[in-house]
Design a protein with these regions (language model features):
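RNase H-like nuclease fold core
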Residues: 1-53, 61, 134, 143-147, ...
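RNase H catalytic domain
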Residues: 9-15, 55, 59-135
């Protein structure tokens, strides 16, 4: 099965700040209309950390082997996800032996990829759900909560 994960945050600056984030899972099963699942949350963190947190939350929903393509405006996360095996080989440490930034999130993502035998790819830039996700994050004012939003949320598309 082919699954696309679309990531978005409400702020794209690099500073550590409170921000909203979200993901859309889009599963392609044969010729059927894609099935989507949505999750939103909020946390204090950097742009990269919140994108990784959204990806982590999306991957929790996976239980079997599949192909996953991650779409995000975060070019760093898109590039590094392709090198996750290299990061794991160094135990998520830099050349000085110190843990890389967001090591906990990278380790969790790597564990899930291995556990489910996920074949991963990534694209950086604006994506199909960017505008919709930004609108949803604005609608909810200051408090997005954590994880999946209620059934009353409008569906993407």
């Amino acid at each position: 099965m082919k699954v696309n994960i679309y990531l978005e945050t409400d702020k794209q600056n690099q500073e550590c700040t409170w921000r909203k984030y979200g993901y859309v899972l889009e599963a392609m099963a044969g010729r059927c209309i894609p099935v989507t699942r949505v999750g939103f949350g909020s946390a204090e963190g950097t742009y990269h950390k919140c994108n990784l947190q959204a990806l982590e939350e999306a991957l929790v929903r996976f239980h079997k082997e599949c192909e996953v393509c991650v779409y995000t405006k975060d070019a760093f996360v898109a590039a590094r996800i392709l090198k996750i095996d290299e990061m794991a080989a160094t135990d998520f440490k830099d050349t000085k032996g110190k843990p890389i930034k967001n090591a906990k999130e990278w380790e969790s993502i790597c564990r899930k990829i291995k556990e489910c035998s996920i074949v991963i790819s990534a694209h950086s830039g604006k994506h199909t759900y960017s505008v919709w996700m930004q609108e949803e994050m604005k609608k909810d004012g200051g408090d997005m909560g954590k994880g999946m939003e209620p059934e009353t949320r409008t569906e993407p598309g």
